[in-house]
Amino acid sequence: MAKEVVEVLVTGGRATAGPPLGPAIGPLGVNVMQVVKEINEKTKDYEGMQVPVKVIVDTETRKFEIEVGIPPTTALIKKELGIETAAHEPRHEVVGNLTLEQVIKIAKMKKDAMLSYTLKNAVKEVLGTCGSMGVTVEGKDPKEVQKEIDAGVYDEYFKEE
């Protein structure tokens, strides 16, 4: 029972039989349109966001299964802000502001895919991404918020750990 795994990054709810998907799975002998339909169904909640998808094909039976990953942190931040692109000069240009609650929401979505053991550290990882995108948090530079988290200013947000 040989299995082939194809990993691609698709736009949520808008996968097509064209590149990168079609050329990657076509030679494996599965119905490409069926795969595309199932991917679009499973990624519709991530509409417009780049989503990592694994297509696992059993090359003998031609059966397939789809595993949908979590979009990159940058995509989740952009969706939360309702913006298309991050800052071109992140240290000089601000493209949006998130509340700490929004950052915590993103960290909870990504926590399983992160290297962090605690929610507090996952939030600090998301804050680092905010800094590289030109996004402020609570109207402040994300590095400042990270220092405040270390100092215990926001401990009430992390009590459930």
UniProtKB/Swiss-Prot annotation:
Q: How does this polypeptide assemble, per the annotation?
A: Part of the ribosomal stalk of the 50S ribosomal subunit. Interacts with L10 and the large rRNA to form the base of the stalk. L10 forms an elongated spine to which L12 dimers bind in a sequential fashion forming a multimeric L10(L12)X complex.
Q: What is its biological role?
A: Forms part of the ribosomal stalk which helps the ribosome interact with GTP-bound translation factors.
Q: Entry's Pfam families? A: Ribosomal_L11 (PF00298), Ribosomal_L11_N (PF03946)
Q: Which domain of life is it from?
A: Archaea
Q: Which PANTHER family does the record associate with it?
A: 60S RIBOSOMAL PROTEIN L12, LARGE RIBOSOMAL SUBUNIT PROTEIN UL11M
- UniProt keywords, alphabetically: Ribonucleoprotein, Ribosomal protein, RNA-binding, rRNA-binding
Q: Does the keyword RNA-binding apply?
A: yes
Q: Which GO terms describe its molecular function?
A: large ribosomal subunit rRNA binding; structural constituent of ribosome
* Family that this chain belongs to: Belongs to the universal ribosomal protein uL11 family.
The UniProt entry's GO biological process terms, in alphabetical order, are: translation
Q: What is this protein called?
A: Large ribosomal subunit protein uL11
One GO CC term, this protein: large ribosomal subunit
CDD domains the UniProt entry points to: Ribosomal_L11
